[in-house]
Amino acid sequence: MNTGGLTATQILNKAEQKLSSSTIIADVSIMIKRPKWTKTMELKTWSKGVDYAMAYVKGPEKDEGTVYLKAKNDVYNYLPKVKKTVKLPANLLSQNWMGTDMTTDDLVKLSKLTLDYEAKLSGSAQVSGRDCYVITLIPKPEADVLWGKLVLWIDKIDFIQLKTTFYDEDLDLVNTVIGGDIKNLGGKMLASKLTMIPAGKVGQSTVITYKTMKFDTPIDYSFFAKSNMPKVKP
């Protein structure tokens, strides 16, 4: 297979560089689809490096003002109705967040795949009419990660991650994420829409749409303080 001389790790690096930034600020819509109902949430998110992330829930109204914070290895949840900040136990990171198909880990943990996984080129395939490299990722022995294996489909032209499958430690399929609606976000061509489909659950999905993204806007570390959570506004 012709990869233009690129290794699997180099291809993965190019895909990661699409989101490489000192900071990312985004407006995000999350639609939860179930067989009998649909719910939409609006978020504002801020991240700095791999250790700091904040998410403010703008809607629906009953959840408005809820804030999530990841600061290094600690994760907190601010509840505006009771004006209380709660530290989340580590096991909550692997549980579904606010009824979505995303875990709290998916939402707030920003991990660099090239640090945590060994990459292997597995072939080529088409996704949404685009030719893609297929990259298989296996956790490094020392990596503290949730997944036993990931398979990524990365566009050969723009190095956009168009599909990802997530497998548990027994290598059973857990989730599939498909990227679409490629557009310019903050000066980068990216998949603005991500559809997460849990395995074995018919009619169930979570659709994440990035409405705006800003890269490299200066954010002070003090913004990601627990004491700042009640003051965060979108």
Give the ranges of each region predicted by the language model.
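Short loop/turn positions at the edges of beta-strands in beta-sheet-rich folds
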Residues: 20, 47-49, 158
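A short, sequence-level motif marking secondary-structure junctions
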Residues: 45-49, 71-72, 91-94, 180-183, ...
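Flexible, processing/modification-adjacent segments and terminal tails
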Residues: 2-23, 29, 38-39, 67, ...
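Beta-strand-rich interaction surfaces with strong enrichment in secreted/lumenal proteins
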Residues: 43, 122-123, 197
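Broad, structure-driven detector of short, well-ordered beta-strand segments within folded domains
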Residues: 44-45, 66-70, 152
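Short hydrophobic/aromatic-rich beta-strand segments that constitute the beta-sheet cores
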Residues: 26, 53-57, 75-79, 85-87, ...
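Gly/Pro-enriched, hydrophobic low-complexity segments
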Residues: 108, 128-225
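N-terminal, post-signal-peptide region of Sec/Tat-exported proteins
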Residues: 25-54, 58-62
